[in-house]
Amino acid sequence: MNTPAYAEIGITTNFSFLRGGSDPRAYVHQASILGISAIGIADHNTLAGVVRAYKELDNDKVLHKPKLLIGARIVFIDGTPDILVYPRDRAAYGRLCQLLTRGKRGDDVTRIEKGECRLTFSDLLAFSEGQLLVLTLPHRFEPAQALDVLAKLKATRAEGVWLAASLVHRGDDRRRLARLDDLATTAKVQLLATNEVLYHDPARRPLQDVLTCIREKTTIEAVGRKLEANAERFLKTPREMSRLFRDFPDAIAETMRFANKIDFSLDQLRYQYPDEPVPPGKTAQGHLEDLTWAGVDKYFAGKIDDKLRATLKKELALIAELKYAHYFLTVHDIVHYARSQNILCQGRGSAANSAVCYVLGITSVDPTKVDLLFERFISKERLEPPDIDVDFEHSRREEVMQYVYRRYGRHRAAIIATIIHYRPRSAIRDVGKALGLTEDVTAALADTVWGSWGSGLNDMQVKQAGLDPQNPMINLAVELATELIEFPRHLSQHVGGYVLTQDRLDTYVPIGNAAMDDRTFIEWDKDDVDALNMMKVDVLALGMLTCIRKCFDLIDQHKGERWVLASVPQDDPKVYDMLCDGESLGVFQVESRAQMNMLPRLKPRTFYDLVIEVAIVRPGPIQGDMVHPYLRRRNGQEKVNYPSPSPEHGPADELYKVLHKTKGVPLFQEQAMRIAIEAAKFTSEEANGLRRSMATFRNVGTIGKYEDKLIGNMVARGYDPNFARSCFDQIKGFGSYGFPESHAASFAQLVYISSWLKYHHPDAFCCGLLNSQPMGFYAPAQIVGDARKNGVEVRDIDVSYSFAQNTLEQGSGKYCAVRLGFRQIDGFHWLDEDEEHLKRSLLSFRGAPLGANPESIGPHMPGGMDSGLDAGASPRNDKKEDWANRIVAARNRRPFTSLEDFARDTGLPKRALILLADADAFRSLGLDRREALWQVRRLPDDVPLPLFEAATAREQPDEHAKPLPLMPRPEQVVADYQTIRLSLKGHPMEFLREMLSRERVVACKDVNHQNERRRVRCAGVVLVRQRPGSASGVVFMTLEDETGIANVVVWPKIMEQYRKEVMGARLILVEGYIQSSPEKVTHLIAQRMVDRSHDLIGLANDSLTRKHPVPSGDALIEPLNDDRRDHADAPAQKIRHPRNVRILPPSRDFH
């Protein structure tokens, strides 16, 4: 007897977050192996995982292709049993998306919180047309309710109604199936067999149990009946399902009738990019060409050579052929809006290969100075939509994002999703909690994991956590955590990628609310969108643009010089001299220790040298062993030659055009692609596949299939095997993270501009960096220290002189002085001027009438405005008080004369006064930190307003007749670091120097003057830890003391031996030997490491517990710590245990 065909329609994937135990792709493969005819993905109130299953059907390893049914399991908030919803056709699919959007977004009255979906049965009925509806019932159910639901479903315009039948394996399955069959007969619906699958293979049962515990916030011991009763909820063979339903064979046959009714596939989504408004009588292409030639007049005064003119015409012709004009007009419009609001922006990525993008003002790479490869941006052969990435100031990017929403409407525009996956740290923490391990144990395991990435924990790491890897519970925790890694945890927003549509976006994919009031995003991520050929616009944020704009503003305000990106003088030899010395702290892209070390070796003297500098310290060139050959050739230590094939296979200069700018060594992605085409003779299709495989680190696993072909073809044509291998290794490195030349050129513009600012205006550069935090490699203490080293005076925070932001004052030397602002005080409330920009722009958007001319809200060509604004979308309600500007406003009325005068005039709460006193901000009033704290303590909790002061005046007793002892300098420095994260009074290490010298520990600056291979001991505060993927497990550490910094290299063996110290120490002692390069770049190669953080804690403990004569009953006030920020009326805390005292801000770790 033949086994009947079977379709499993009740599959829950791991995109039903913390419910499903298997990835959608695993189900496709398992169904193929088991011979299942169709699989129905029905995740809980979401379509987030369906594209992954759809794409996996194209995998060559899936030999038998099951039919994919796209649906969702609707879970209601009104007690209705779950219903599986499968759309029959494209129109019904759109209604399912709109149903889910309603549940995730709400309406004009009710806003749904991020991650929730609140649907009622009546919501489903309103969107039921064209749907195949399957009612699922719990183990125990009320027949009357079920019959009522079935009757109401049948009364809709649905394509059909079914009753799901599944076995629960609790001993009463036959009786339960008979009840369900009777119910279906009574309701006149068909019974539909399903295993209500939760995982693809029974081995996943333990992980699914753990997911249940994580979801329910409980442990395996306490979870009880919330777990599945058995391990039967896996994908079963048609034969097994037929056996289980042998008494109800029609329920099995009905699964195929059900599947055959569904005509919808994601192939049917016909994406259309929105039309852009153009002048009357113009087409989009004609308008784009007009803007292009107008840009030629603007950027080149109309005078361009024949080569550039031909390039522009070629690009415009291809844009016309592929019908991309509207897309270019969109990006031009967004950039134009940003510039109209004085928001700096710059395009990057493959778009920098386009001359059209340059003359439209989107990118900044001059096509007359850099060779462009337009085919990398747009290609007729690839048939992939263009992807233009534009960076905006990170502090004002939200204004641009809200403009996009307003411009297109929230039903036509949304941010794409980012899937937050489990990483090793989060996996071990959540699994450990679920298994009942203590917090100490899970924290110890998690703390052995470097960064966010990795494949799990090994026995060595378990031992370093002080645990036994052979312990069954520890072993199980590690095993399950390893399984959980890469599972989706929840959806978040992409950093700025928008999808825009001509018709309603919510008929393509559900849209939900983000955590921020004015943001909405779809359920699909970048890879999903790319797979369906949907075009996106990237509105990205870049902190350096914010910094540069703030620098320009400061220079204009305080020095009377006006600069824009394009006006900064180019090719300044003094700027390049600074970079050749490795002086690049704070400079965009070249401030890491690896880049600082590379600068003296590469010795950049031209803009193109900076392009190479940006690209060369990347996994591609490093893994391909291209860095050292390039440097040797650049420095004249090695002859420049160009790899060539055998004479019978091609000319000797076959690769000259590809490699001549980089001295015969491939450094960029474009070069790797051209080598594949020219030297390995890849077809355009093969080269495109290779390009896609190295597009992001996530696809590293797919690149191996090109290895034999690329290396084999090159060797067969006479290329040196070592060169062929290096080329492929380089391509693999680009798969991890590498820069195309166009992208490096875009970033090199900002490298030069930030370097120019650092050299010529170090005062403004320091101030701009501080006002743009958080960004970059270095903390405020190092930024300030570098500025002072370069001759900039930096002044303390003071209530009589400081503003919210750090600013410039008249200096006594060559540069202005930097006055630290109130924003530097941890926990102090201040509002950024950029937040005010956003509020004003949102209010102006709200004021523009729907359907108004776009000119009313931005610089557009005349055309209708989409009426997509939500009534519930209002400006962000920021309830944070602006203490800083209250001080400035009071100060402008009259100078402060005393602390009581200050408190009365500003009306600040007592907590704000304590923070200011902690920050030593009352010096201009004759009060040091201790005296100010004392006086604040004596003030009443509520300072009266001046009008009522006389009525409530009471005499303040003079509780002490003599001045308080001066606070010692070590105590001052510690207090500074605790409150403002830096100190102008000293460095904590200088107070440990005497002790360290007795231990023969040298200062950081002295490390750089030791002889090669000399053994030394050095100690310092850990500023930065780096473990680049290209460094094969090597860790680079930057240590700082009062004399400067030292670079430490930790080889993998030493890293494993001292993992705890490397990852956890704030102050570390390193013993090792010196290694120096000819360019005088010195490293300390670690051989032994000791965590000396307790010395810092001891310093703080002395400061916090030092006995002083204070009145009985009063405790010495310590600086506030972070956990008191949100409690305005919180009393002063008692002195904490030294291990909990924060001495220094944490290091900045990169991987």
From Swiss-Prot:
SMART domains: POLIIIAc (SM00481)
Origin superkingdom: Bacteria
Subcellular locations according to the entry: Cytoplasm
Keywords in alphabetical order: Cytoplasm, DNA damage, DNA repair, DNA replication, DNA-directed DNA polymerase, Nucleotidyltransferase, Transferase
Annotated region described as Disordered, given as residue ranges: 1108-1151
GO cellular component: cytoplasm
Any one GO molecular function term: DNA-directed DNA polymerase activity
UniProt enzyme class: transferase
Enzyme Commission code: 2.7.7.7
Reaction catalysed by this enzyme: DNA(n) + a 2'-deoxyribonucleoside 5'-triphosphate = DNA(n+1) + diphosphate
Any Pfam family matching the protein: DNA_pol3_alpha
GO BP terms in the entry: DNA repair; DNA replication
Family, similarity comment: Belongs to the DNA polymerase type-C family. DnaE2 subfamily.
Function description: DNA polymerase involved in damage-induced mutagenesis and translesion synthesis (TLS). It is not the major replicative DNA polymerase.
Protein name: Error-prone DNA polymerase
